[in-house]
């Protein structure tokens, strides 16, 4: 599970440096990260379908697959810049809080606030772009829950 959520997406950064992907470093990292994340999440989703996994793992991987498809559509197709970082933190934070314990809301909100603050401070995204990323994530999560049912 961790291979698909962490190792494959993080491989984007060394891959970009080894193969010099993109005209400039930051743009190459963003593109490579998007491709590696999509590959990792899709492989994770397929893995979750082929092996016995918990309901939460199924929801998480389907949410990520829907989210990455929506981000590709919005960011590449329509030229918007919905935040991938906001997207990748919001639904998991919601799921942890909802399914494990309400006290997970505290670190979840702090994590999301840290993502927002760093993106705003570094001028990577505007508040509407961050909110769009979070909205994509929550919508994908709701769709995933509808597919697998509430437990």
Segments from the language model and where they lie:
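Membrane-embedded catalytic cores of phosphoryl/pyrophosphoryl-handling enzymes
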Residues: 58-151
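Selected alpha-helical membrane-embedding segments in polytopic membrane proteins
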Residues: 1-51
């Amino acid at each position: 599970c961790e291979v698909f959520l962490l190792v494959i997406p993080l491989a984007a950064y060394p891959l970009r440096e080894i193969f010099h992907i993109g005209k400039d470093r930051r743009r190459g990292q963003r593109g490579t990260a998007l491709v590696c994340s999509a590959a990792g999440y899709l492989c994770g989703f397929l893995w979750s379908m082929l092996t016995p996994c918990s309901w939460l793992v199924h929801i998480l991987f389907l949410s990520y697959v829907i989210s990455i498809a929506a981000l590709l559509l919005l960011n590449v197709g329509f030229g918007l810049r919905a935040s991938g970082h906001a997207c990748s933190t919001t639904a998991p934070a919601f799921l942890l809080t909802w399914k494990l314990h309400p006290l997970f809301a505290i670190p979840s909100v702090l994590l999301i606030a840290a993502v927002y603050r760093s993106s705003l401070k570094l001028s990577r995204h505007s508040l509407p772009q961050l909110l769009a990323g979070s909205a994509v994530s929550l919508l994908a999560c709701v769709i995933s829950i509808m597919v697998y049912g509430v437990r």
